[in-house]
């Protein structure tokens, strides 16, 4: 068995040497790097084993680096198995996979023979198989027999076609199976006939040798007979003869010694002649028999040649049947795919109708959205102008509010003085009533009454002068303008709500600022008073209130920071969801384009007239509009939310900065060092908040 395997390996190697390759391929060491095998596969099927695949095979995998050789062999073997499964629809489950490590390390001939066997199967099943088969037929008969045995082994190890469709398994399977069985029987009969032909040719050669020897003997005997006849004639002519002793024996007469001697010699020669004639007849019979055998052998050889020609025709027919069977399988598979594609096409038609209806609605929505976008673009510049005007008005309002607070504080002080004077007046009136009895006391009471009246009149006049009528008119006018601006912003409801919230916070902060200014003025007034006990009590109350206010401010600041962090996290989440949505839209777009391309191919394959009638570009445009319209409302909602949050953050930060700066200005002027130290530090600027 090992000898047969080695013969098969050398036969496959001799066949592989006939290929025209640039790489060396004369022995196992040169084939172990896989480069020659890859070039051969590229020559067999260039459409599958492409030049880019061939470039992956490293030409430097020679010498002692067996790992590079093994990497090349792995690529070649994997591509071979893929070719058998994908192109030829064959499975190699029962075929023993070649051990690539033995080939790479030791150049094992048995494993290399399996690999060459797979390459041979690829050669006889490729598009140029006829030329390779003729090259194989041009080799020696022994090599042809070994190559045929290798192909039969490849077929007998389970090299079967892949799964057939149910419709073609009855017809195509029976035809191909019968053709393969007839081919195997014919190949076996051809082998037997070839062996018988070789044996008969050997016999003919041996008989020809024997016949030549017998003919040589015949010619020798004829020459000897001629010599004897010539000698006999010469002896008959010579009447006198000389004996051995030189004495004449006399004439040849009956009864003489010479006559008897010659008679005896003649009898011996006749016997020899009869024997030679018998041998000649035997040789003639043998020659006739050999000629008849030779003619019979020639007839058998002609019959064998005819049978071999029939076998070749049968092989060609089997190849044609195989190709037709493969084409039938491919056509059936294509038919099934076309049926599925036709069903998909009908579904796509229905979907296209639905999408066209949707697209009409989306076009209307898109037009509305474009009008809204134009209106928004027009109002955006106005909003910026209004923002600047609002900031200027806020600054003016803060200045006026500070003045108003001072005036109100002065008014309260004057009112308190007025109340004190009224109380003093009442007490003086009571004293006047009590001290009316005496004239001196009446005069003194009258004088004091006049001074109280003058002080009251002066206080009333001062209080009337200190009333902020212009300031109140200006504040009302500013509020009316602010309200008109809010109403004039159109459909910007979210921004209006944010502005209202900001205004409410601003009013709340103004109230707090007002109370703080009142406390500051009261503290300054208390500091100017002379009573130390009242001063200490008021200082303690004010310090306590300021500490509470500071704690409230810090809590509000922490809440604002946490709210800002939550807004930032929401913005990040929205950005990530937006990016994922864009990726989904891109994937859907690519999938849609593939579906449209498949639909075009199906329509072209079914009916090219219908394919020409359909406007694929319009369909694609409608689908793209549908996808855009589906994604646009969601994006507009996201943008609106992001804009509202950004505007809210900007307004809050700007309001905080403005309040802090005003507090710092109001608290820093006209205060003592200790009073300034008790105040809370201003918040960070907007740029610092943004940087965080």
From Swiss-Prot:
Listed GO CC annotations: centrosome; endosome; microtubule; synapse
An individual GO BP term: endocytosis
Gene for this chain: hook
Protein name: Protein hook
Alphabetic keyword roster: Coiled coil, Cytoplasm, Cytoskeleton, Developmental protein, Endocytosis, Endosome, Microtubule, Synapse
PANTHER family linked: HOOK PROTEINS, PROTEIN HOOK
Any one GO MF annotation of this record: microtubule binding
Organism the protein comes from: Drosophila willistoni (Fruit fly)
Description of its domains: The coiled coil domain mediates homodimerization.
């Amino acid at each position: 068995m090992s000898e047969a395997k080695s013969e098969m390996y050398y036969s496959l190697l001799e066949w592989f040497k006939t290929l025209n390759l640039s790489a060396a391929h004369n022995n196992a060491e040169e084939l172990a790097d896989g480069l020659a095998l890859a070039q051969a596969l590229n020559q067999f099927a260039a459409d599958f084993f492409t030049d880019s695949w061939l470039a992956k095979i490293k030409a430097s995998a020679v010498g002692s680096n067996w790992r590079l050789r093994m990497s090349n062999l792995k690529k070649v073997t994997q591509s071979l198995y893929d070719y058998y499964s994908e192109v030829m629809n064959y499975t190699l489950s029962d075929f023993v996979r070649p051990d690539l490590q033995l080939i790479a390390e030791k150049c094992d001939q048995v494993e290399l023979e399996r690999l060459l066997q797979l390459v041979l199967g690829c050669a006889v099943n490729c598009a140029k198989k006829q030329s390779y088969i003729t090259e194989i037929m041009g080799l020696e008969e022994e090599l042809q027999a070994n190559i045929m045995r290798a192909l039969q082994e490849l077929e007998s190890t389970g090299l079967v076609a892949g799964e057939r469709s149910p419709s073609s398994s009855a017809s195509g399977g029976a035809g191909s199976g019968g053709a393969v069985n007839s081919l195997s029987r014919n190949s076996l009969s051809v082998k037997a006939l070839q062996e018988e032909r070789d044996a008969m040719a050997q016999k003919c050669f041996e008989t020809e040798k024997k016949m030549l020897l017998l003919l040589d003997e015949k010619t020798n005997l004829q020459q000897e007979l001629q010599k004897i006849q010539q000698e006999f004639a010469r002896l008959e002519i010579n009447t006198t003869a000389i004996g051995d002793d030189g004495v004449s024996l006399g004439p040849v007469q009956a009864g003489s010694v010479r006559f008897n001697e010659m008679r005896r010699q003649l009898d011996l020669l006749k016997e020899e002649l009869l024997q030679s004639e018998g041998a000649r007849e035997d040789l003639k019979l043998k020659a006739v028999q050999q000629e008849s055998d030779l003619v019979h052998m020639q007839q058998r050889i002609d019959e064998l040649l005819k049978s071999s020609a029939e076998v070749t025709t049968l092989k060609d027919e089997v190849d044609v049947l195989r190709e037709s069977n493969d084409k039938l399988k491919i056509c059936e598979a294509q038919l099934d795919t076309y049926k599925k594609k036709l069903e998909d096409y009908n579904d796509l038609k229905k979907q296209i109708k639905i999408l066209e209806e949707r697209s009409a609605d989306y076009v209307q929505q898109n037009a509305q959205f474009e009008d809204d976008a134009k209106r928004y673009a027009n109002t955006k510049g106005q909003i910026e102008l209004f923002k600047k005007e609002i900031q200027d008005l806020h600054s003016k309002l803060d200045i006026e509010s500070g003045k108003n607070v001072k005036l109100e504080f002065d008014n309260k002080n004057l009112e308190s003085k007025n109340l004190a004077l009224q109380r003093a007046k009442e007490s003086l009136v009571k004293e006047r009533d009590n001290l009316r009895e005496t004239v001196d006391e009446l005069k003194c009471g009258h004088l004091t009454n006049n001074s109280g009246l003058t002080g009251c009149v002066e206080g009333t006049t001062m209080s009337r002068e200190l009333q902020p009528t212009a300031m109140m008119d200006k504040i009302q006018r500013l509020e009316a303008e602010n309200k008109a601006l809010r109403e004039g912003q159109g459909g910007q409801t979210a921004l209006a709500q944010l502005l209202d919230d900001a205004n409410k916070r601003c009013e709340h902060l103004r109230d707090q600022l007002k109370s703080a200014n009142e406390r500051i003025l009261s503290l300054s007034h208390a500091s100017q008073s002379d009573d130390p006990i009242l001063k200490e009590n008021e200082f303690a109350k004010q310090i306590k209130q300021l500490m509470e206010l500071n704690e409230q401010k810090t809590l509000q600041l922490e809440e604002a920071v946490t709210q800002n962090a939550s807004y930032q996290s929401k913005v990040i989440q929205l950005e990530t969801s937006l990016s994922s949505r864009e990726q989904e839209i891109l994937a859907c777009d690519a999938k849609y384009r593939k579906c449209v391309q498949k639909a075009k191919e199906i329509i072209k394959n079914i009916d090219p007239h219908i394919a020409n009638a359909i406007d694929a570009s319009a369909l694609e445009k409608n689908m793209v509009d549908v996808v855009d319209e589906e994604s646009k409302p969601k994006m507009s909602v996201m943008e609106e939310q992001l804009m509202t949050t950004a505007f809210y953050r900007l307004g809050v930060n700007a309001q905080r900065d403005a309040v802090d700066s005003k507090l710092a200005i109001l608290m820093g002027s006209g205060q003592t060092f200790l009073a300034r130290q008790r105040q809370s530090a201003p918040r960070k600027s907007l740029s610092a908040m943004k940087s965080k």
